[in-house]
Swiss-Prot record:
UniProt note on tissues of expression: Expressed in most tissues. Highest levels in testis, thyroid, duodenum, skeletal muscle, and pancreatic islets.
Gene3D superfamilies per UniProt: Cysteine Rich Protein (2.10.110.10), Homeodomain-like (1.10.10.60)
Keywords noted in UniProt: Activator, Developmental protein, Disease variant, DNA-binding, Homeobox, LIM domain, Metal-binding, Nucleus, Repeat, Transcription, Transcription regulation, Zinc
Compartments reported by the entry: Nucleus
Quaternary structure, from the entry: Interacts with DHX9.
Organism the protein comes from: Homo sapiens
Protein name: LIM homeobox transcription factor 1-beta
InterPro entries assigned to the protein according to its UniProt record, in alphabetical order: HD (IPR001356), Homeobox_CS (IPR017970), Homeodomain-like_sf (IPR009057), LIM_Homeobox_TF (IPR050453), Znf_LIM (IPR001781)
Annotated region of DNA binding: 219-278
Amino acid sequence: MDIATGPESLERCFPRGQTDCAKMLDGIKMEEHALRPGPATLGVLLGSDCPHPAVCEGCQRPISDRFLMRVNESSWHEECLQCAACQQALTTSCYFRDRKLYCKQDYQQLFAAKCSGCMEKIAPTEFVMRALECVYHLGCFCCCVCERQLRKGDEFVLKEGQLLCKGDYEKEKDLLSSVSPDESDSVKSEDEDGDMKPAKGQGSQSKGSGDDGKDPRRPKRPRTILTTQQRRAFKASFEVSSKPCRKVRETLAAETGLSVRVVQVWFQNQRAKMKKLARRHQQQQEQQNSQRLGQEVLSSRMEGMMASYTPLAPPQQQIVAMEQSPYGSSDPFQQGLTPPQMPGDHMNPYGNDSIFHDIDSDTSLTSLSDCFLGSSDVGSLQARVGNPIDRLYSMQSSYFAS
């Protein structure tokens, strides 16, 4: 952080190498130089003794004017010496910061320090108290809990931009250590603890069993029980602002009859609770989205697998129709029975006459009708064969007669 140097006195003078007679006028040193007539030396003629012209700090050009301005051991043109904010010419004093010049009014408006307690500007003539990078008025440098003004040599803690004296900081540390931020309320209400109040013995036993691994010399931590009205007031204020200012906390403490520190701790725990709930809700949303995405991917894969196979035709019930035929139309000897010998020649049971035409004979077939039996031949064949049942009876009688 640059520290402004100023106000700087302005010097108005002539270039070097000339005789002068000086006088002070309103803080400006005015020097008037007159050239002394006389013969020029050899060094002046050769240029080795000629002084180098001064360079303006504002425009970085050499100054060839009769007069120049001197500020903070740097040279300026008269027209270049002006405020960087309001462009007004600087005549008596100025403020220098970041290689720029400012008048007093603009410098105080732009770069004046502000009190970290009341956020008001600090005048250059005021005494201040510093804590790290924060600057305070003397009256604003006090504890935010007990409002006791801190003096030189007092021990204090700067936490989240707020000043705490040593005593209040130790109380806050003990109170925060006694409260778990994972609970819904660090200070419970009476209606929530209604079921637990009659079991005092069980509560003391459970508390003792929970503290078995801890230091027994440590004193019991204080515990505050809130009523329903107090919780409602805190929640209503929390809905308006999760980080109330000190005045709001003091008002709540006065309305509920609690200390300001208890109110502050409740708001801290409530903020931690809301952050935890938001984090848990976000995790649930991410888990649901991942499950939904997995189901969609699985269903799409199943559809792709099913689409690669052709659908099978539905099974058709084949009904075999059993044709009922008369006994005479079927072979009576299909069941493996040995047919009895027919009377006469068993090789030619139907006689010696040929039923079919002899295809291998010399006579050729003149037409397709020659290959089939004529109607007369069919009738003679049926007369020759007769009824199969009658033939069966005749065969049986001939068998037993022999």
